[in-house]
Structures are given as structure tokens and as C-alpha cells.
Amino acid sequence: MKKLLLLFTLVFLSCSEVEDVESIIIDNNSKWVEYYNKGDAKGIASLHTLDAVVIPPKSDFVVGRDKIEEMYKAEIEMGNGMLGLQTTEVIQEGLYAYETGLYDIKMTIEGEEVNDYGKYIVVWEKQKNGDWLCKKDIWNTSLVYSN
């Protein structure tokens, strides 16, 4: 009976340590949206690993937290924006979580309203301190580009 009680206790304790990674990522996305909508490029960059890679549509790779901050700063300065993110799936494998989702953004650029929406994939990496940060980010856009 004591062994059964010990086994039950161990199973219960191990279950209570399971992280709800999807909730953590959704919370991170809420911060991301908040930072973006108030124009805080440094805040957005802080949600990325130091060596993160961002792959925007029709652009080169943006590598490193500092460059990512510069990219978002330039985008934010381009026009007043309101971003929305919707996580559709999170799959965790060890120290990595793979998120797919949808985004929408409304911006006013030079007095003209621009609406964009698309899909994204983010790879999140668990840090030594327990935080989950964006390691890789790629998205597509509904906007048509002209050359």
C-alpha cells in the first residue's frame, strides 16, 4: 500500500510540473501585440533569442536580436499599425515548440489605410531560465508586391 501511495504521489507531482507551453506562447504573443501596437520595437526584440532569425516576405534573413529590433523599428516608423495574432496550433518537442498561426494588421501609411493578413510559423526555444523565446519566424502576406 505504501508503494502504491508513493507511486501515486510521484505521478501526481510529475504531472503538476508539465508546462502549458501553448498558454505561454499565447501570453508571449499578447506581449508581442502590445509592444507592436504601442510602437515598442525593443520590447518585440526582447521576445527573441540573441541569435534569432526572422524571414519576412520578399526580404533577406534578419539575424540577431539587434537587427530584428531595427527591422521592427523601421516597420513601426513606416505607419501607425494595429497587429492581431491568432495561434492555430502549438506542437512541443523538448526544448522547442512549433507554432502556426494567422495574423492581421492595419496600418496607415502616408494617409492611406493598408490591411494585410497572412499565416506564420514560429519556432520557440526554451531558455535556461525557463522563458520561451522566438528562435525562428517566417510569415507570408496577402499584399501583392510589384517589382
Predicted regions and their residues:
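A solvent-exposed, acidic/Ser-Thr-rich amphipathic alpha-helical stretch
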Residues: 22-28, 41-95, 102, 114-115
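Short beta-strand edge/turn micro-motifs at domain boundaries
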Residues: 117-143
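A short, structured loop/turn motif at beta-sheet edges
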Residues: 90-97, 112, 125-131
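Generic short beta-strand segments
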Residues: 101-107
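Bacterial signal peptide processing site
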Residues: 16-18
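Sec-dependent N-terminal signal peptides
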Residues: 4-13
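Generic hydrophobic alpha-helical segments
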Residues: 31-32
